[in-house]
Curated annotation (Swiss-Prot):
Bilayer disposition of the protein: Multi-pass membrane protein
Organism encoding this protein: Mycoplasma genitalium (strain ATCC 33530 / DSM 19775 / NCTC 10195 / G37)
Keyword Aminoacyl-tRNA synthetase attributed: no
Protein name: Lipoprotein signal peptidase
One BP annotation, GO: proteolysis
InterPro entries reported for this sequence: Peptidase_A8 (IPR001872)
Gene: lspA
Function: This protein specifically catalyzes the removal of signal peptides from prolipoproteins.
Amino acid sequence: MKLRKTKFFSQLKHQVLTANQKPFLFYKLTMIGFVGFIILLQVFILRNALNGEMDNTMVANSGFINIYVIRNKGVGFSLLQNQTGLVYFLQGLLSVIALVFLVFMVKYSYIFWITTLAFGSLGNFFDRLTSANDSVLDYFIFQNGSSVFNFADCCITFGFIGLFFCFLIQMFKEFKHSKNQ
């Protein structure tokens, strides 16, 4: 049993070191620093700018996307509204999974999207953690829409969409490569 644990940790260490060699590690750290900083900065700048607005208040009506401020204690579409512990767990879990994937990722094309996803989730997690009533401030709404969302939600959504397209492109390239052989 001990031998298997040692072998597992040895392989894990090898994978981490392989996935994080100097030029690639520099790229990852740059993405984490730059993208993470920009996302968290935007989350808190927008939160502070809109925090003084009353709940359910229309702040700006620009046409396509309007600003309508509400507090949301749940996750997407206000699901799990009164289950604060589960909401924290799910957002924390998403952040941890994304960061673990980031540590082991060896493809440049995925790094930006995983970082965007991870820090969007962390933005919501920290927004909720620092609010007085365990809620996030949602403020964007499409014209004639009913769903209200925030910048961190956009980062999570675009992170998943970007990862999906990267995965499709990779599958297409591998299929094309295997077909040519």
